[in-house]
Amino acid sequence: MAQSSSPISGVAERYAGSLFELALQANSVAKVESDLNSFEAMLAGSSDLTRLINSPVFSGEEQAKAIAAIADKAGITGLTGNFLRVVARNRRLFAVPGMIKAFRQIAAEHRGETAAEVTSAHELTAAQQTELKAALKSVAGKDVAISVTVDPSLLGGLVVKIGSRQIDTSLKTKLNSLKLALKEVG
C-alpha cells in the first residue's frame, strides 16, 4: 500500500474525497462503501483483474470497457460504477486500492469512527471482530471500523494499524525479534 507521502496516495485521496462528496449528496455512502468492498474482494480474488488495473499495456478506453463489464456483472452500478469507469478512462486504476482505503477512512470519520486496518494470520470470526472492536475502542476513545485482511505469513497474532500507530502482536515479528537477539548474543 502506498505511503501517505507518495503521489499515489495523493491521487487516491482526491478521488476518494470526490466520490465521498457525491455519495453524501446522493445519500448513498453505505451503498458506495458496499460496492467498493465488493470490488476490493474481486481484486483480491482475481489475478487477471489485478493485472488489468496495474498494466500500462491497456489503453484507458480498453480498461474502461473491461471495468464496465466487470462492474455490471457484479451488480456495481450507479455512482460506484460510474466512478470506476471515470477512473479507468483517466488511467488511474492502479490507485483504486488506495482510493478504497481512503474512502473507508473518510466514511468512518464522517460517522464519528476511526478506521483500523487489521491483518491476521487466520480469518477472524464475527465474535473475535466484535471483541477486537471493543478493545480498540478503549484504546482509540471512539468507535472503530475495522478492515480485516488475512496474511498467513504472520503465523499467528495480529497487526493493527490505527492512524499513525501500529500494534504488532504477530508471531512472525516475535520470532524475528528473537532471531535478532540470538544473533547479538552469539
From Swiss-Prot:
Keywords for the protein's UniProt record, in alphabetical order: ATP synthesis, Cell inner membrane, Cell membrane, CF(1), Hydrogen ion transport, Ion transport, Membrane, Transport
GO cellular component, one term: plasma membrane
Subcellular location(s) per record: Cell inner membrane
Topology with respect to the bilayer: Peripheral membrane protein
Residues spanning the membrane: none
Domain of life: Bacteria
A Pfam family of this chain: OSCP
InterPro entries: ATP_synth_OSCP/delta_N_sf, ATPase_OSCP/d_CS, ATPase_OSCP/dsu
Protein name in the entry: ATP synthase subunit delta
The organism of origin for this protein: Mesorhizobium japonicum (strain LMG 29417 / CECT 9101 / MAFF 303099) (Mesorhizobium loti (strain MAFF 303099))
Lineage: Bacteria, Pseudomonadati, Pseudomonadota, Alphaproteobacteria, Hyphomicrobiales
